[in-house]
Curated annotation (Swiss-Prot):
Source organism (scientific name): Salmonella gallinarum (strain 287/91 / NCTC 13346)
UniProt protein name: Peptide chain release factor 1
Keyword tags: Cytoplasm, Methylation, Protein biosynthesis
Gene Ontology CC terms: cytoplasm
Residues bearing the modification N5-methylglutamine: Q235
Region: Disordered, residue numbers: 284-313
Location of this chain's protein in the cell: Cytoplasm
PTM per Swiss-Prot/TrEMBL: Methylated by PrmC. Methylation increases the termination efficiency of RF1.
Family: Belongs to the prokaryotic/mitochondrial release factor family.
InterPro entries the UniProt entry points to: PCRF (IPR005139), Pep_chain_release_fac_I (IPR000352), Pep_chain_release_fac_I_sf (IPR045853), Prokaryotic/Mito_RF (IPR050057), RF-1 (IPR004373)
Keyword Protein biosynthesis: yes
Length: 360
């Protein structure tokens, strides 16, 4: 391993021990914000510190085995120990490389999930409803909280558009690769000839930013319209103009929120979603510029990408980005998404490692 990498690992290991000592300080414990921040840092450093300690121990084992090679009686055993220690050293070095990859600062944050019906009319709206249910089930299994921010229901069920905030540990990091195009192939309930129709939805996942990190938005750049909320089937319709539509004039981004009965609450929700959308657009633009200099298989979050096809007649789901096909559609639609998400995450890590080696 390069001396520069070893030096970096030593510094991180020392910082881990320093943070551990700070967490036992009475003054730090009394300051809850500082204590929480240090606890997060300690958790983030723990894996790399533990792995580096194991690597150091293996280097000692290699040195000891090499010294034993000079002893004729110990040589055979020393050769076996040396082989095992070198294999373990290689494995630990690979783990440390992954642990040293730059972390996406947004990965641990809550996220806004948008599902929009695309081509396919009523069937696309129904599929948007199925997708939202799928993500809700996944969130429930991970003990995340789902809060609907805004929705526009389809005429025959499902959603033309639905926006929700998902809160919990590592939400954005887990869901960010869901952004993109999702296509469904199935026979609609209204289809008398049994023909398979293709419909599509787009999904966007954006991190929820703390107020201090939201993009600066000039109030003069906003057009705010109020209107009456429309309830499903004519029920619970507000008689006041509590619904809010905010248009960000420079980008053309439009956000509506009518979930709350209070105009003030709807405006606050709409502004938080608007900030996340502007941030996502800026991030995508920056990533596109970076990707032009090297191969970037994943991570662009470009909504025009075709992520997956869900084929109901065949019970098949295909992720086109990594050529993965599973005949486990029923489980997928029930929210068992790790079998699809984990391979994407691993491919992304491999892509980052390849980029890192290119830089070196």
């Amino acid at each position: 391993m390069k001396p520069s990498i070893v030096a970096k690992l030593e510094a991180l290991h020392e910082r881990h021990e320093e943070v551990q000592a700070l967490l036992g300080d009475a003054g730090i414990i009394a300051d809850q914000d500082r204590f929480r921040a240090l606890s997060r840092e300690y958790a983030q450093l723990s894996d790399v510190s533990r792995c580096f300690t194991d690597w150091q121990q293996v280097q000692d084992d290699i040195e000891t085995a090499q010294m034993m090679l000079d002893d004729p009686e110990m040589r055979e055993m020393a050769q076996e120990e040396l082989r095992e220690a070198k294999e373990k050293s290689e494995q630990l070095e690979q783990q440390l490389q992954v642990l040293l990859l730059p972390k996406d600062p947004d990965d641990e944050r809550n996220a806004f999930l948008e599902v929009r019906a695309g081509t396919g009319g009523d069937e696309a709206a129904l599929f948007a409803g199925d997708l939202f249910r799928m993500y809700s089930r996944y969130a429930e299994a991970r003990r995340w909280r789902v809060e609907i921010m805004s929705m526009s229901e389809g005429e025959h069920g499902g959603y033309k558009e639905i926006i929700a905030k998902i809160s919990g540990d590592g939400v954005y990091g887990r869901l960010k690769f869901e952004s993109g195009g999702h296509r469904v192939q199935r026979v609609p309930a209204t289809e008398s000839q049994g023909r398979i129709h293709t419909s599509a939805c787009t999904v966007a996942v954006m991190p929820e930013l703390p107020e201090a990190e939201l993009p600066d938005i000039n109030p003069a750049d906003l057009r705010i319209d109020t209107f009456r909320s429309s309830g499903a089937g004519g029920q619970h319709v507000n008689t006041t103009d509590s619904a809010i539509r905010i248009t960000h004039l420079p980008t053309g981004i439009v956000v509506e929120c009518q979930d709350e009965r209070s105009q003030h609450k709807n405006k606050a929700k709409a502004l938080s979603v608007l900030g996340a959308r502007i941030h996502a657009a800026e991030t995508a633009k920056r990533q596109q510029a970076e990707a032009s200099t090297r191969r970037n298989l994943l991570g662009s979050g470009d909504r025009s990408d075709r992520n997956r096809t869900y084929n109901f007649p065949q019970g098949r789901v295909t992720d086109h980005r990594i050529n993965l096909t599973l005949y486990r559609l029923d489980e997928t639609m029930e929210g068992k998404l790790d079998m699809l998400i984990e391979p994407i995450v691993q491919e992304h890590l491999a892509d980052l490692l390849a980029a890192l080696s290119e830089q070196e």
